[in-house]
Amino acid sequence: MFEGMSFIFDIDGTICPIKKKEESYEDLVPYPEMVEKIRAYKEGGARIIFFTSRNMNSYQGNIGMINANTAKIILAWLDKWKIPYDEIIYGKPWPGHHGFYVDDRTVRPDEFLRLSVEELDELCKKSRCD
């Protein structure tokens, strides 16, 4: 049903809440409706990819430190919550607290949850500059 499709997800603020200072990443609880929909797409044949900037600011963009420290926490967390995936890419550039990601194939988490694949495609087509 979803063969040939890929969904690339951020983790923090998308799959789970953004960690507060007094919290640990291990204790974050994922959004149930997001996990359910990811599972449904994966079961339907879609590729699920996580692309995260977690700890890019903390480690000043040092991917080696992220691989050594952050990756194992994310892998254990995904396993704990049985969140399926095909790939995880670490080191997504972090735009800072006042920056943005601009992309013609971007949808917001709430749009992903409420819209069909066809509606998501139409939404992306409308936002292109061509």
Where are these regions (language model features)?
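Catalytic phosphate/metal-binding cores of nucleic-acid and nucleotide-processing enzymes, i.e., regions
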Residues: M1-D130
